[in-house]
Amino acid sequence: MNAEVYQWAVVGAGPAGIAAVGKLIDHGIPGDKILWIDPAFKVGDLGQFWSQVSSNTRVALFVDFLNDVESFRFGEAAAQQFELLKLPLQDTCKLEHIVKPLQWVSDHLQQSTTARKESVKQMNLSGRQWTLTTEENEYKAKNVILATGALPSSLNYPGVDVLPFETAIDKEKLSQTIKKDHCYAVFGSSHSAIIILRHLVELGVEKIINFYRSPCRYAINMGDWILFDNTGLKGQTALWARENIDGKLPSSLSRYIVNEHNLARYLPECHQVIYAVGFEPRKNLVIGDYDHVRYNPHLGIIGPGLFGLGIAYPESKADPYGSVESQVGLWKFMVYLNKILPVWFKYHT
């Protein structure tokens, strides 16, 4: 057991975890008083699974994210000539272009903090301190930020062979997996579902069935805000959907509303199914008596000295017309963190 009590522990080293560590340092927390735990330190799922996926965030906002934290030292990183800095600011891009500078930031932040390549399995609050238990060690911290990410959701229809989402969303991996004469079902109509449908069409699959619950939703620039900013289709994915989903369906693609009749009729035709129906928080960490406690979606507070950030703990926010969405995206995480971190400093154990 490690005898030191850290001021802050950050669990997770994806974009939200990197932002949290950077902002703590910016606010004067000494790096050696910050415990940072992640099993890989490879920019989370973004770096390990999604780098070949097209973003729905503009390049300009990725650059804003990197420049917003002084301890990121991204001014120095600019000398590295990351490809991100050469791209048109108003365009979207492959996520690999933000992963590379984030990995650079993560690498140097690890040098100035107490970084441990482990997985937290359990946490408990006692004596006004959090104990974080990994397979190898126990650590203590006064405050903990969970930036543990989320996994693709599954619908678990019986008797179907599931093609993993992380394979389907990566066109290169998908091309090595599919058989063109097989039938593939894709569940969903979100950004990722449309990307996967496009992949399958462009790879020449002969029969594709899309099961969906709602029509395509598009992000619309309203000037100083964006309608359906978090849930709407953007960029090249939106253009493709307008032409091929709301326009003329490719000959290989059929679409059906999800209901009992359509599932019974068409699902048996499919050799494999792909679930592109969103994400859900990881559940591989047991937190004392907090298993059924919901986080506050406006403050990120889970309990005293315990906070959540990132895709597993997004801010809930209404647009000017009252439509409420979860704010998911790197720049949105940063804006939210800037707003709530002063509260976190006061809401200790």
Say what each PLM segment does.
Residues M1-V43, L85-T349:
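Flavin (primarily FAD) cofactor-binding/catalytic cores of flavoenzymes
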Residues A19, K23-Q80, S214:
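N-terminal FAD cofactor-binding segment of flavoenzymes
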